[in-house]
Amino acid sequence: MKLNTNSNAYIIIYSAILVVIVAFLLAFVFQALKPMQDANVALDTKKQILYSLNIRGLDGAEAEAKYKEVVKTKAEDDGHILYGCVVNGEHITVATLKGMGLWGGISGYLAIKEDGTVYGAYFNHESETAGLGAEIKDSQAWQEKFIGKKIFDENDNVILSVVKKVEDPESQVDCVTGATLTSNGVDAMIKESLKGVRIYQVDCRFPTKSAEEE
């Protein structure tokens, strides 16, 4: 009996078989590439932590080596993820930041000196406007404005702020020009993410697992 390739039944069965084959191939490719994707994500995270420590311009292998050299511990307490680091003999704590910008999620890392001032900062975003809100990631000069700023008051409350008009240069940073709402998101992210961090601040002596045990 000759198969009728123009029949509805044939078309439906043929299409279903193609869908199954394509789905299988996509699943196979995804699984095959997943280890590489996970490794890339892990490397990007390490680079961002290094950026907050003012260590930039390293390729993949260099970044991996430098991360192992300076990042000594990782601690998770009360929702905080902290990294204990030693840079040029100085104990630095890197705090993880997460929040919302104007159009999507924003994140970052803030490096904190033992005296409670900023050692360095790095911010990232998912979908902020290029040339405006995206400057929180793209402008190293803006990130460097945080260096030296006071983060906590005498009661360990977060006073580091991103504002439209700086009145207290000791603890305030100018917002990104033309990106007030994104800057407000960074300010809220800092306040929320660092709440209570002073209590849990760690360094290389913190009794926790190695930063490589992730």
Predicted regions and their residues:
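Flexible, solvent-exposed loop/hinge segments and secondary-structure transition points
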Residues: 2-214
